[in-house]
Amino acid sequence: MMCSSLEQALAVLVTTFHKYSCQEGDKFKLSKGEMKELLHKELPSFVGEKVDEEGLKKLMGSLDENSDQQVDFQEYAVFLALITVMCNDFFQGCPDRP
């Protein structure tokens, strides 16, 4: 049976997290360095050419609910939900929505 588009998208969200989280330290959490690399490589149109260090520090601080200096999967999922809401809001203002 073929996976639906949404199921494929969910699989990509999960595998992308683990692709970066296993590089250093706790393999189930993103360190600041892992998060920076994920943002740079996977969301280039959101962060531009270079990840802003001050912006990354603020982002990590706002995502890191338990203050362990890392982003766990639940915190990552909240981040993706926020980006998804922003994209939805943006496209609602476009005459030819995707």
Curated annotation (Swiss-Prot):
It holds the Pfam family S_100. Residues 13-48, 51-86 form the EF-hand domain. Keywords: Calcium, Metal-binding, Repeat. PANTHER family: PROTEIN S100-A2, S100 CALCIUM-BINDING PROTEIN. Ca(2+) 1 binds at residues 29, 34. The gene is S100A2. Homodimer. Interacts with FKBP4. Interacts with PPP5C (via TPR repeats); the interaction is calcium-dependent and modulates PPP5C activity. Interacts with TPPP; this interaction inhibits TPPP dimerization. May function as calcium sensor and modulator, contributing to cellular calcium signaling. May function by interacting with other proteins, such as TPR-containing proteins, and indirectly play a role in many physiological processes. May also play a role in suppressing tumor cell growth. A subset of epithelial cells including normal human mammary epithelial cells and keratinocytes. Induction: By growth factors in early G1 phase and probably by cell-cycle regulation in S phase. DNA methylation probably plays a direct negative role in suppressing S100L gene expression in tumor cells. This is Protein S100-A2. GO terms for molecular function: calcium ion binding; calcium-dependent protein binding; identical protein binding; transition metal ion binding. It comes from the Eukaryota. PROSITE patterns: EF_HAND_1, EF_HAND_2, S100_CABP.
